[in-house]
Amino acid sequence: MDICICYFFTILTTISCWNVTSYSKNSDFQYLSSKNFLDQLQIASNKTVIDIGCGNGKITNYISSLVKDGSVIGIDKDSSMIKYAKETYPNVDFKVMDIQNENIDKKYDIVVSFFCLPWIVNKQASFHHISNMMKSGSKLYILAAIMETNHVTLINNLMKKDHWKLFFVNYSSPFDYLNDIQYDIYANQSGIEQKKFKVYNIPYTFKDRQSLHKFNLAILPQLNQLSIEHREIFITELLNDYFSFIGSVNLTINFTIVKFIGCRV
């Protein structure tokens, strides 16, 4: 089975550890997958939309082109991401906000969240706040990701090696809650009816090892424990372990995606 050693694209409202410039340069997969999903929805131009976990704002800006007679706002917990988004897309509305703890006192036609929800610890509270921003008939569209077991094992084993373990003393790993995809339960308890739940793979081929390296370097949360120099070494060793595990230098990664569609009752 292929595993994804570089799976950490689902972010931006829970952990403020990514370098926004690096992430923006190495997040094509996230953007293209989200854009493809949006294009399938054929959103009417007069809809009001909120993008939860908007990150650098690139996909929020794309949404703004779809709702020219409506409106869109992007929210994210990471203030550096919001600062970047405001500077890069000055005609789009962005706000620093943690969906786990607060919601906007406004009702939206559509709520979207791309590659964000798995990183949220308190998913039930988040669904509750999402529901409060929806009116009867409002739609919720989510793309998320499932963490592959061998992927987790490789990273955990690397952190336990003698030359790395001192960097991770008392480290709280996000792996503990990443695979919680009980979205139907959280939605139902929040007044949102599940309309669709699908798990599927999207293959993505990186052009070379350096691209794969940069992708990991941009978004792997464990790197926040390390100096810049050590981060480069950590990723190099991680990729070496990965290629050794699969038995080849295969740059095609199968990302396992969760699609959830819900409607406010």
Swiss-Prot record:
InterPro entries: Methyltranfer_dom, SAM-dependent_MTases_sf
Superkingdom as given in the UniProt entry: Viruses
GO molecular function, one term: methyltransferase activity
One Pfam family of this chain: Methyltransf_31
Enzyme class: transferase
Keywords of the record: Methyltransferase, Signal, Transferase
The protein's Enzyme Commission number: 2.1.1.-
CDD domains associated with the record: AdoMet_MTases
Stated family: Belongs to the methyltransferase superfamily.
PANTHER family: TRANS-ACONITATE 2-METHYLTRANSFERASE, TRANS-ACONITATE 2-METHYLTRANSFERASE-RELATED
Full protein name: Putative methyltransferase 235L
Organism: Invertebrate iridescent virus 6
